[in-house]
């Protein structure tokens, strides 16, 4: 290769050694690395092409194809002293970060990445400390590491970046177990020959366990103790003199058998608190028990693949889940069967194999025949690989699936998923390009329709466009196309959307800062813009838009400073509201929220305490024992609306008592203490809630995926759910006073009583009745806070309590039948049964 090709790229290059050869016809292997030797430094140049190229030389020419170029400079002792991402920033600058090491080769300092305009050729080694200080506006722009002065070089302290954190570090102390010091005292648990837990009378000998004490920037301490096999034996979190201990107990072969969480130390009940695991003679997990649940059993075939499994609910019905494999070890059939325990125990003597036969025979007429007998099998999943011969089989032929034009050897090509809650099936097929990327995907729908997705990719594999065609059995059809645009560094910049013959809409536009962080979002052809800001540690500090804004404070603001990443205070403005509202937060030593003090105005000193939440106690497992919640009690009054006392059986909520007698104003959100019994909540063998008498839920039924299939209320109302075997929700049926509303979820098309109503988009939805776009404005956790239409009019405002309850909702015009229906449920049933689903209010 001609050395002149690298002139201006890296100075003083003496030679180039090609380490990786790549093919110009393939976009899968898209990086080329070269070792570069220089008179004073050496480095590795990595070029990742973004376009198809004709040869390696074209990647290094300034007029060649688009590519990403990285340079790593060595320090001469095997470490990397500097990494440079050449021209990667939005303004085309080099993003550079530097590293320094001590005399033993340990990382001593790491400078934050900084965008630098190269002097001379891009990719040159740079001195960036001063540039970083100027860019960030902080003098402390280096993470620094301190080590023990010994041959072990154990990390003692890590000082993070940011002037606010000067002198604050995440520190570690290395010690051992000592019986004389309470914080370093360790119980000794053993596993008997019969697999039972035994607490030894003789503790660990002093010094037999290696101990590490960690302390974060706020002084919260955590001990970990390891045995001679480097297995974690004890994890201890300290809250003053109170210890929260989790013990890990191993058998003589090193298998984890018991996990004993903090609650067990005060109430040594294995059934309620312990995680229990058992193994066979080949160290395969055969028994698993979670706290408060019946155990699950696992059975393997002769080549160690899971063949049968059974949870507590299945055991009550004498059922087992089964898995059948092809000759390559791929799962081809899943389902449930009624095999006897005796038959299941002999599974380890055989190799389970599913053979694909001709015709509609075998398990569920799928064509697969199992080598092992299955009693009354009910098939939930069927998978086909390598070819598209399944197209003519039972079920597929009704949908006219096309033949594949590119070899799919080694890939999943088709599948059948049962619909839990009905007798139907979902049929699907995937088609690939030569690089094994899915370029076309077809799937039938619960309403008899079909969805087709066709995807075009860039050279390096990013989607450029997705064409979606949806049909249903009535003849209705819908077509939508997403188009994606990327910048020179392959960052997503624009998302356009068009459905049917309507004009294309610039749905979303991204702008990034020089560090690659999202800086601005623009929705709806740029009409609505949201700006984002971050602190020096890349923690989100601000979301700023005309309809929703939010400020997050960590070490500054009105609350007690938190240096470990907890939010100390938060303010927001929603909809047309001009007055900031917010919370000041307090935490205990375990990082659990204890107080959320509400206020309004810039200093949160107006209308204080109106929507406070206070946790009056936690148990050792982190369950809330008491909660006080304030809210609106009249047109002008605010007071305690919930004063809750919660009791548990292990981790299961057993009873809730509300000592507050003041109801929330205008049927607002609050806990409804609907009954006073010693047990108000009941559960099944798998730990699923089956009764919630406070919410008048007299029965909650579940399918084999442990997903709720039906919720029944005391007044005769009910909600039923339909899922496919992968757990995707397909249908919801609400029965209210004898009237039914059926909601079908056909991909991103939502039907109400057979009529298409909503087309979900990446940033909201389109109401299909009028063709209007609606946009969801989200907070830092992804909650939908404001819904606006395509003209920027506010349709809905949601404000939340600190623990997630809906503090206040201000609806505008009802924008969908889902929203209208949800509000009618709230009026008739109350807030006690409400959840948020797809950004809309739904009952559960």
Indicate where each model-derived feature is located:
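Carboxylate/His-rich catalytic cores and anion/metal-binding grooves
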Residues: 166-193, 225-226, 233-234, 239-263, ...
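Beta-turn initiation residues at beta-strand->coil junctions
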Residues: 46-52, 72, 82-89, 109-116, ...
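Aromatic/His-enriched, Gly/Pro-containing loop or helix-boundary segments
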Residues: 62-64, 90-97, 110-149, 273-327, ...
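Extended repeat-based solenoid scaffolds, especially LRR ectodomains
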Residues: 181-226, 358-433, 550-563, 569-572, ...
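Bacterial Sec-dependent N-terminal signal peptides
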Residues: 1-36
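A residue-level detector for well-ordered beta-strand positions
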Residues: 71-72, 99, 145-147, 172, ...
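Short, small/polar residue-rich loop motifs at catalytic or cofactor-binding pockets
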Residues: 66-68, 93-95, 141-143, 208, ...
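A motif-centric feature for acidic-aromatic and gly/ser/thr-rich catalytic loops and repeats
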Residues: 176-178, 258-259, 264, 277, ...
């Amino acid at each position: 290769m001609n050395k002149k090709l690298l002139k201006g790229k890296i100075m003083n290059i003496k030679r180039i050694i090609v380490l990786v050869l790549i093919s110009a016809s393939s976009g899968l292997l898209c990086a080329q690395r070269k070792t570069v030797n220089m008179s004073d430094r050496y480095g590795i140049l990595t070029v990742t092409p973004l376009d198809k190229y004709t040869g390696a030389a074209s990647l290094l020419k300034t007029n060649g194809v688009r590519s990403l170029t990285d340079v790593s400079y060595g320090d001469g002792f095997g470490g990397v002293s500097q990494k440079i991402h050449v021209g990667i920033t939005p303004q085309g600058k080099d993003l550079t970060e530097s590293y320094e090491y001590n005399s033993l080769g340990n990382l001593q300092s790491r400078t934050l990445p900084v965008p630098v305009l190269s002097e001379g050729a891009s990719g040159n080694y740079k001195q960036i400390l001063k540039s970083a200080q100027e860019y960030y506006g902080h003098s402390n722009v280096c993470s620094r590491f301190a080590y023990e002065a010994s041959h072990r070089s154990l990390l003692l302290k890590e000082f993070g970046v940011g002037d606010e954190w000067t002198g604050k570090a995440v520190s570690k102390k290395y010690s051992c177990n000592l019986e004389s010091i309470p914080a370093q005292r360790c119980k000794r648990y053993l596993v008997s020959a019969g697999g039972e837990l035994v607490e030894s009378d003789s503790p660990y000998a002093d010094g037999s366990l290696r101990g590490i004490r960690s302390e974060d920037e706020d002084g919260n301490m955590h001990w970990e103790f390891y045995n001679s096999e480097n297995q974690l034996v004890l994890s201890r979190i300290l809250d003053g003199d109170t210890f929260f201990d989790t013990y890990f107990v191993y058998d003589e072969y090193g298998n984890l058998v018991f996990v004993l969480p903090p609650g067990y130390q005060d109430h040594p009940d294995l059934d309620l608190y312990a995680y229990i695991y058992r193994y066979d003679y080949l160290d395969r997990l055969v028994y698993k028990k979670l706290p408060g649940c019946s155990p699950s059993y696992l059975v393997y075939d002769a080549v160690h693949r899971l063949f049968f499994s059974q949870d507590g609910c299945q055991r009550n019905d004498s059922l087992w889940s089964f898995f059948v494999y092809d000759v390559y070890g791929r799962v081809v059939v899943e389902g449930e069967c009624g095999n006897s325990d005796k038959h299941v125990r002999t599974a380890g003597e055989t190799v389970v194999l599913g053979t694909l036969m001709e015709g509609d025979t075998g398990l569920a007429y799928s064509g697969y025949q199992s080598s092992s007998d299955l009693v009354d099998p009910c098939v939930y999943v069927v998978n086909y690989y390598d070819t598209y011969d399944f197209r003519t089989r039972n079920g597929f032929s009704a949908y006219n699936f096309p033949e594949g034009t590119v070899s799919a050897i080694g890939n999943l090509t088709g599948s059948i998923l049962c619909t839990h809650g009905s007798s139907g099936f979902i049929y699907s097929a995937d088609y690939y390009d030569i690089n094994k990327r899915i370029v076309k995907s077809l799937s039938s729908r619960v309403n008899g329709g079909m969805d087709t997705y066709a995807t075009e990719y860039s050279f390096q594999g990013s989607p450029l466009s997705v064409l979606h065609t949806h049909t249903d059995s009535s003849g209705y059809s819908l077509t939508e196309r997403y188009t994606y645009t990327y910048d020179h560094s392959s960052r997503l910049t624009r998302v356009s959307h068009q459905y049917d013959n309507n004009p294309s809409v610039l749905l979303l536009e991204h702008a990034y800062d020089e560090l690659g962080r999202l800086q601005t979002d623009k929705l709806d052809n740029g009409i609505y813009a949201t700006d984002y800001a971050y602190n020096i540690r890349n923690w989100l500090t601000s979301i700023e838009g005309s309809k929703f804004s939010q400020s997050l404070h960590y070490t500054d603001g009105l609350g007690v400073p938190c240096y470990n990443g907890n939010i100390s205070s938060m303010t927001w403005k929603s909809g047309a509201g001009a007055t900031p509202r917010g919370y000041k937060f307090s935490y205990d030593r375990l990082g659990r929220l204890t107080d959320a003090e509400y206020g309004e105005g810039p200093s949160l000193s107006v209308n204080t305490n109106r929507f406070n939440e206070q946790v009056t106690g936690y148990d050792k497992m982190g369950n809330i024992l008491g909660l006080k919640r304030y809210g609106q009690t009249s047109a002008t009054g605010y007071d305690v609306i919930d004063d809750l006392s919660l009791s548990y059986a292990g981790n299961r909520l057993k009873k809730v008592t509300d000592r507050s007698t003041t109801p929330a104003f205008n049927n607002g959100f609050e806990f409804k203490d609907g009954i006073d019994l010693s047990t108000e909540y009941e559960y099944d063998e798998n730990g699923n809630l089956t009764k919630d008498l406070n919410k008048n839920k007299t029965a909650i039924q579940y399918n084999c995926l442990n997903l709720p299939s039906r919720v029944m209320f005391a007044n005769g109302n009910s909600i039923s759910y339909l899922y496919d075997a992968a757990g995707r929700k397909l249908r919801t049926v609400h029965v209210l006073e004898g009237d039914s509303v059926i909601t079908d979820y056909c991909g991103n098309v939502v039907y109400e009583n057979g009529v298409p109503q909503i087309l979900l988009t990446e940033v909201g939805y389109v109401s299909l009745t009028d063709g209007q776009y609606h946009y969801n404005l989200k907070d830092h956790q992804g909650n939908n806070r404001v819904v606006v239409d395509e003209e920027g009019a506010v349709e809905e405002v949601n404000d939340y309590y600190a623990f997630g309850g809906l503090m206040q909702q201000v609806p505008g015009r009802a924008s969908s039948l889902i929203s209208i229906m949800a509000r009618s449920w709230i009026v008739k049933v109350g807030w006690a049964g409400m959840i948020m689903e797809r950004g809309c209010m739904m009952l559960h």
